[in-house]
């Protein structure tokens, strides 16, 4: 659910079922990344189950698109809490684990709205540019611990972009088209 209220974990549960059907192991948690305690619980459950954490993909998101004049500070804060602070919470909670392991891979998702701007997305653009600054600094800090961090600014047809992109284009922009870059 893109509203940011009463998040829906069904998509993650579906992915868990798909992974398990192929013989893999997976776990869904449904943490609200804007809540540090929920993120810490999610990471603790991951460590309890597998004993290590190798990869983090920061990809949670919501939209509150309005021109800057019409948008509220509350919506601005909500968007930055999920996109920027959610990335901070997840990365901070995993960072020392990865450093201690001397191995970790972190992906943050940015957006062309953060890199170039997009009308009505001041809050989103600010958050997405913020994760770029974070990534650039952490790439330097993590290098000596073999913790690598990269950013993607993908365009994909997702639950968040459904209804914003032409139906024909949406059908071509599957998340699977972004997967090779995430796995790099």
Predicted regions and their residues:
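Substrate-binding pocket helix/loop in short-chain dehydrogenase/reductase
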Residues: 67-68, 72-77
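Active-site-adjacent segment of SDR/Rossmann-fold oxidoreductases
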Residues: 116, 132, 137-147
